[in-house]
Every structure is written in C-alpha cells, then in structure tokens.
Amino acid sequence: MKILVSKKITLDLFCKNPIQIIEKEKNEIISISKNKKTVFYVIQPKALKKLFDIKEYFVKSKITKKEKKIIEKFPMHTNWIPDKDFIQKAALWGISLNEEVSKYELASFISYWEAEGLFFHHIQWQQKLARSLERSRSMNNAIQQKKDITYIPVPDQKTPDGFRGK
C-alpha cells in the first residue's frame, strides 16, 4: 500500500478538513498517521477501481483473448464447451470418465447452470461437469441393473454361522 500512497497527512490535520484534503488529492490514496505511525488509509473509489479492475489489468498486460477467457470468472452460457483434453483433466481430478461428453449431457448441464446464474472460472466449470457426469452416469448404471420390475426378492432359509438356528 505504501507504494500507492501519494500523500502522508497527520490525523489532526486530516480531522480539521477531511473533504478538502480528499478532493485535493490526485492519486486517490492518502496515508493518515499519528505519532509517525499509519493509523488508516483513505482510499477513494477511483483508486479501488484501478486496483481491482481486471479489464485494465488485461489491457496493461498482453494476454490473449483465449487466456483472458480462461482466467476470468463468468456465468454459464449456451456456447460454453469443455477443453479437448477434458477426459484427461477429469482423470487428474480423480474422476474416471470412460467416454466423451455427449451433446445431451452437455446441454443438460448448461441449461441447469445457466438458470443458476453463478460465476466460476473455466476450470471450475469443467470440474463441475466432470462431477455431474460421474454422478449421472453412475445413477444410470444403477438404474439399468434394477430394470426388472417384476422381480420379487425371496429370502433364503440359511442361518449364517455364529447365529442360533432352529
């Protein structure tokens, strides 16, 4: 913060006319001190915007649009697609996917998260998709195994070892 401070003022001087001091300062950051120790900083909204404006950061640094897209958080949209090496990345995250994402699975995922309106990084969206696929595919496998609705379970008449029998 010290690098960004344009002016150091004592607390007594600041308390006499704070509005005039703030309006006069061009750098928008003032250090207020008492007994040669900083008590607090006055940071104007313009300075905060400069500090935290991601667009300005990307203008200053020469980052490509593709890199910018991956770095920023964004809400889910209909044109979103996972990376080409999505299956390999999922394996690194401990999620074993045997087949590629179908267009129906992707459409279902996108429509759900589009409605939510939450913001995540591209990598986070991919992780969410991988977990979603893992859950839905495992549920589909379980449902396929239980397809025979006419099956009536019959208990066996064996008494396990260690239990009292008849």
Curated annotation (Swiss-Prot):
Keyword Cytoplasm: yes or no?
no
GO (cellular component) term, any one: primosome complex
Q: Which UniProt keywords apply?
A: DNA replication, DNA-binding, Primosome
User: So what does this one do?
Assistant: Involved in the restart of stalled replication forks, which reloads the replicative helicase on sites other than the origin of replication. Can function in multiple replication restart pathways. Displaces ssDNA from a PriB-ssDNA complex. Probably forms a spiral filament on ssDNA.
Q: What is the lineage of its organism?
A: Bacteria, Pseudomonadati, Pseudomonadota, Gammaproteobacteria, Enterobacterales
Q: Which Pfam families match?
A: DnaT
Gene Ontology BP terms: DNA replication, synthesis of primer
| Highest taxon listed in the record's lineage | Bacteria
Q: What is this protein called?
A: Replication restart protein DnaT
